[in-house]
């Protein structure tokens, strides 16, 4: 496989007719992977980069899935004594149904394409995790612009680094340990659909956005953080 360019092969999870039981199993295994390979820790690092002291914050996740990231953030905010409200947006109704059963307080769940979501209030922070690689390059530029326009403090992205070591490692691990045909097929493909640092730089350049950082994180993730340059002048609503 050539990792110089992104794969645009469709993931099974993006098909509209996947049975709910299969989606649920997929989400359970992804949560396990995020827990043990540091995915949730990267998300918490992104939150920490954007929070203002202990002021109340509203955090919105686009492509929220079953709400695992939001649960991890809620636990972190509780330890830090940070009052937090959540918005979770997902185009898949099964994901919203699973998220609605999580122990999340003060949350608005929206079944919608993120671009069409009707937000009750402007989020302080918008983020996504393992979401961006589902989109084309052109869609990614528009997504960055949408996140910038709708977040008061800034946004962050936790997504995959396209690399042959990551690809073959996850391919072997999921073949050995996964019980989900979705994970076995989509996990290595997700890496092949992931990004290089140069591609992120190009996306931000085309989007006309500055004041951002791109950090490589184990295991083969990018943490991309944009901070609103006027954050110091923003007061809580």
Spans of features found by a protein language model:
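N-terminal, positively charged/glycine-rich alpha-helical extensions of SAM-dependent methyltransferases
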Residues: 1-28
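Class I SAM-dependent methyltransferase Rossmann-like catalytic core
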Residues: 20-46, 50
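A conserved beta-strand element that flanks and buttresses the S-adenosyl-L-methionine
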Residues: 127
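Conserved Class I S-adenosyl-L-methionine
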Residues: 193, 197-228, 237
